[in-house]
UniProtKB/Swiss-Prot annotation:
EC number(s) reported in the record: 7.1.1.-
Reactions accelerated catalytically: a quinone + NADH + 5 H(+)(in) = a quinol + NAD(+) + 4 H(+)(out)
Subunit structure and binding partners: NDH-1 is composed of 14 different subunits. Subunits NuoB, C, D, E, F, and G constitute the peripheral sector of the complex.
Name recorded for this polypeptide: NADH-quinone oxidoreductase subunit B
Tagged with keyword Protein biosynthesis: no
Database matches in HAMAP family: NDH1_NuoB
Gene giving rise to this polypeptide: nuoB
Main location: membrane
Keyword line: 4Fe-4S, Cell membrane, Iron, Iron-sulfur, Membrane, Metal-binding, NAD, Quinone, Translocase, Transport
Length: 184
């Protein structure tokens, strides 16, 4: 006999972290950072065929101060990188970043000095979405994966500890250029 059998109907048992995670995951407001062809697929996701509003993303935010998810869609040039970082810094906590497309994830086919070889060199990335360009269905799937991640994110001191551990693990990772085995 557990506690669940002793409670009357209509009682829900949970933790504050689980309830806060549920609320946060169902009210994401994305700030779009469309830089190339991936932005067209991102705009298609907001249309009636894919209906991103059913996942709590009623509108795309035009200002970073009202957004908590940044979708970086397309290649990021070296000149655009400081602007991307400034927009990320203006977003309120908690905030998440989704790198949409192979150009945002790893520089794509643009292996030259003018393109950032992965947006994770500028801002911390939570979800990487492959493809050139990825289909709207893939973006919806990535957002649902991000919902799962947000649901499990701890609060308060536990959140700060989890973020510090993730940053430390990211600093220990090999640079992207070494992992891809690029020609030099």
């Amino acid at each position: 006999m557990g506690l669940e059998e002793q409670l009357p109907g209509g009682i829900l048992l949970s933790t504050v972290e689980k309830v806060a995670g549920y609320v946060r995951k169902n009210s994401l407001w994305p700030a779009t950072f469309g830089l190339a062809c991936c932005a067209i697929e991102m705009m298609a996701t907001a249309g009636p065929r894919f209906d991103i509003a059913r996942f709590g993303m009623e509108r795309f935010s035009a200002t970073p101060r009202q957004a908590d998810l940044m979708i970086v869609a397309g290649r990021v040039s070296q000149k655009m990188a400081p602007v991307l970082r400034q927009i990320y810094d203006q977003m309120a906590e908690p905030k998440w970043v989704l790198a949409m497309g192979v150009c945002a994830s790893s520089g794509g086919m643009f292996n030259n000095y003018a393109i950032v070889q992965g947006v994770d060199h500028v801002v911390p990335v939570d979800i990487y979405l492959p493809g050139c360009p990825p289909r709207p269905e893939m973006l919806l799937h990535a957002i649902l994966k991000l919902h799962e991640k947000i649901q499990e994110m701890p609060l308060g001191v536990n959140r700060e500890r989890a973020i510090a551990e993730a940053e430390e693990a990211a600093m220990l990772a090999r640079p992207t250029i070494e992992m891809r085995g690029l020609l030099r």
